[in-house]
Every structure is written in C-alpha cells, then in structure tokens.
C-alpha cells in the first residue's frame, strides 16, 4: 500500500508510471487487458476472473431495459455472481473492483428506461464502469439535447452515480461525439473485431492514433482515455495496440473460449477450428438478417465465421430459401448454419483456458515482446 511521504524510490517510480486507467481501477496491472461485454457470453464469473488477474472484466447487460425485462434479471444475477466469485458477498457495500457492465443502446423503445431500470441495479451491485455502445443515430438526431435515453443523458446519469463511462466507437466522428457527451474512455473498435460494430470503419492501425490525436487536440481540458478493440488475440497484438496510443486493450473472441464463458460447445469448436480470419470471417448485415435480429440500425453490422448460410447467400440463393434451410437446420440440431461471431484474429486462438490465465499470458507475452523491440531499437 502506498502512503504519501513514505514511499521508496522504486515505489515512487511505479506510482509515476500509473495511467489514468490504473487510477480509476487500482486493481489493474499494466498492460491493462479488458474483456468485452459480449452478449450471452460475458457473464459475472468470467468478468470476476479477469478482474482477479489484474484486468477489467465486463458483464453483458443486454439491450432490453423495459421494466420486467429478462435482460435486467440476468444482469442482476450475473453481478451477484461476480461479487460471489470475488469473495465479497458478505460486503455488499464494497464496489466490485475491475468489474464493468456493457449496455447496447440500439433498442430505441427501451433506452429511455435505462436510468429508471438499469441504474438502480448498478447502484445496488456497484460495478466500477459502464460500457455503452450502438446508440441509434436517428433517435439521437430527433431527440432534444440531453433528452431521456440519449447518450448524453445516460452518461450524465452514470457520472452522477460515480461510474466510469466507456463508449465504443468505430470512427473519429463518433469518438468526437462520445467525448463531447462526456465519455471517460473511448473504445476505438476496428473492423477486424468480431460481433457488432460500425458497418463503415477502419482497422485500429489508423483508427486508434487518429482518435488519440483528435482527443489531444480538441479535448485538452480533460484527459479522455483510448482503449483499442478489434483483431487482438495475443501479446503481440497488445503491444501493437499500445504502440498506436491505446492505454488498454480489449479482447472479445479470445475470451469466448475462456473456460468461464457462456459460449456453447459447438461455437467453441468453430472458433478453435477456424483459421485465416481474413478469409473465413465475414463482416455483413446478413448475419442479423438470417437471425431475424431487427433491433440494429443499419449503420451497424457484424463479423462472424463464414458458414453454410453465408455461402448460400454469396452464391445468390434467395433469402426465403436460405432462411428456411437455417430454421430447419436449427430445429434438427444441425449448427452448421448458426451464426458464430468472431474477429479476424480467430486463427491465433488455439486453446481453451481459464480467463485469468489468458490475462496473465497476454500480459507476459506483451512484456517479452516489448523487450525484444527494445533490443531491436538499441
């Protein structure tokens, strides 16, 4: 423990090296590894194990925030699970260290309820952060500034209750708006990411430094943190993201095969057997169309492993016929047409292991890679 005025030179050096993320999340270790709030995958146990290993673990909070929604019940259950896993069940007033919640804002019918239904759950369970993503641009444009359910109103309400706010973006334009709305952390997600994302964007190699430069230039009055997401699966990718200007690194696909994740076995198998992600994953609106998922605005699409349904689509099979095959396969237990969200780094993922081990391995790999780079530059 650090006491002002009683620190050694070594301790003073360590303190000087702390980043803004470290100050907000004192249990984190550098480089900061963050597990993404993947819907139906990122549960409380997974988040807790990431936190215990010195990372930041996010629990998926869903997208339906209307009173009585099953998403609300599941969120409360998973946060209680995280508290239990962290050994804090008998300390209900202690904040959950290194734990956050992810909320999808594209369901315009339910976003006005966030502060009425989600916020009380967050206050009760005390995660440290909230990650927002996919606000509907039409809803934002048609609403009065700060109206209920807008990003700005939600961020202000979260700040008033003491939460650090992450906001996921895919363009510099959206990063600017998120920062103007008050976000503390910009999650700069590149198009190599798995799952939902901006339909039009770039990879983190250009996105992260341009977002960082914009924030330094236009938001000088406060420090807005940037973390990178998309296409990272090992320590080499972590170092690359840090070199681009990120203060922390988000991984999604790597954690889908963590032992603690809620990923079904057939999807784990798909992830572990897929390689050459640039060829064998596809970024498209088709994945939501075949799933009949209608809540997503068309500015968002998603990246998933190429499968029989997509191959038929690419070959020109009419959607009605393709969807019939999709439903018949699902009803017969054939998962070859099911959507498995995945990023392009899927080919780097070779095994299933505990989430804490993944975090520690990423951190050590990154440190070793940094040493090698320093040797090259000497």
From Swiss-Prot:
Location of the active site: 196
Propeptide: 1-15
Protein EC: 1.13.12.16
Pfam family, one: NMO
SUPFAM superfamilies recorded: Inosine monophosphate dehydrogenase (IMPDH)
BP terms from Gene Ontology: response to xenobiotic stimulus
Binding site for FMN: 37-39, 229-231, 252-253
Keyword terms of this UniProt record: Flavoprotein, FMN, Monooxygenase, Oxidoreductase
Listed cofactors: FMN
Catalytic reaction list: ethylnitronate + O2 = chemical entity + acetaldehyde + nitrite + H(+)
Job description of the protein: Catalyzes the oxidation of alkyl nitronates to produce the corresponding carbonyl compounds and nitrites. Anionic forms of nitroalkanes are much better substrates than are neutral forms.
Designated name of the protein: Nitronate monooxygenase
Gene responsible for this protein: ncd-2
